[in-house]
C-alpha cells in the first residue's frame, strides 16, 4: 500500500468529513447476520468472521484492495469461479480514507478525499452491487501527514475515534475497517491527548473499535506499528479483537506470535501488488491451502491498466486454480472511473 498514498493527501485535507460526529460506514455482517456476543457463545470477532463465512465459496478469503483514486470498485464483479459461480473476490477494501486531527475542536476524525466520499455518498451505485453478491466492503484508515495516527491515540481518543468509525460504518452500510499505520507525522514529545507511537497504542485502537462494533470486521496491516499486538489489552489477546491480519507483500510467515490467539483462518498470506507486478507464485498460493491459512490479498487490480492482460489476469487465473481448484471466468466488461 505504501507509495500510493501521498496522492490521497492533498485532496483529503480539503474534504474533511465534518459529519463524522454522526455517521459512519458499515452495516454488513451485523445487519445480514445479527450475531451478538451477548446472545452467542462465540466471541465478537468470531461472530464477524462467521458472518463472512457462508457467503463465500471457500474458507480462504480473497481481499481486493482497490485504489479508488483511479479504479472503480465495481471491477471486482468481473471475476467469478466457473464451477461454483461465485465471485472470486470476498472482500473489497476501499483504499483509502484517512485519520486526521481537527485542531479547532481538538478531535481526531475520519477524512475522505473526493474519490472516497463519492463512492460512499453513491453507495447504491458503487458498493451495494458488491454486497448484493456477498462481497464485503471495508474502509481502509490511513495516516495523513498530521499529528494523529493509528498508533498514538490516548485511550480516551481511541474510544472516541472507534465510535466515529462505528458511526461511519452504520451510515454507509459498510462491513468493517482496515488499519494501516503509515504517513502520519507523529510528534515528539506527544501533544496533549496523544501518546508516544507504539504497537500497544495501535492495539488499543483496534480493541476499542471491536468493542464499539463487535459484529463488524476489524482488520490490520502486518506493517509498522500494526505488525504485532503481543501485549493483551485489558486482559484481552489480539485474536479476540482482530479478525484478519493482512501480510505485507510477499509475507508468508505464521502470525500466531504477532497476534496471540489469532487463528490461522484470520491470517492473510503472500499478498500481491498488481500495479508493481509483484505476483505470487503457484507454490506460495499452494502453501496457503496446505498450511491452513485463511486469506490472500491483491492490491491495485484494475482491468483498465496496461498490464492487465499480461500480468493481472494470469495472476487471477492462478488464484482461482490454486486456492479454489476452479477456473476463472472474466466477464470482459471493465468499469471505468465515471466520476
Swiss-Prot record:
Record localization: Secreted
Active site: residue positions: 182
Record carries keyword RNA-binding: no
InterPro entries xref list: Endo-Fsp, Glyco_hydro18_cat, Glycoside_hydrolase_SF
N-terminal signal peptide: 1-50
GO biological process, one term: carbohydrate metabolic process
EC category: hydrolase
GO CC terms of this entry: extracellular region
GH18 domain residues: 60-326
Disulfide bonds: none
Pfam families named in the record: Glyco_hydro_18 (PF00704)
Catalyzed reactions per annotation: an N(4)-(oligosaccharide-(1->3)-[oligosaccharide-(1->6)]-beta-D-Man-(1->4)-beta-D-GlcNAc-(1->4)-alpha-D-GlcNAc)-L-asparaginyl-[protein] + H2O = an oligosaccharide-(1->3)-[oligosaccharide-(1->6)]-beta-D-Man-(1->4)-D-GlcNAc + N(4)-(N-acetyl-beta-D-glucosaminyl)-L-asparaginyl-[protein]
Keyword presence, Secreted: yes
CDD domains in the cross-refs: GH18_EndoS-like
PROSITE patterns: GH18_2
Similarity section: Belongs to the glycosyl hydrolase 18 family.
Assembly behavior: Monomer.
UniProt function note: Endohydrolysis of the di-N-acetylchitobiosyl unit in high-mannose glycopeptides and glycoproteins. Does not hydrolyze complex bi- or triantennary glycans. The presence of a core-bound fucose impedes endo F1 hydrolysis.
Protein's recorded name: Endo-beta-N-acetylglucosaminidase F1
Biological classification of the source: Bacteria, Pseudomonadati, Bacteroidota, Flavobacteriia, Flavobacteriales
Chain's gene name: endOF1
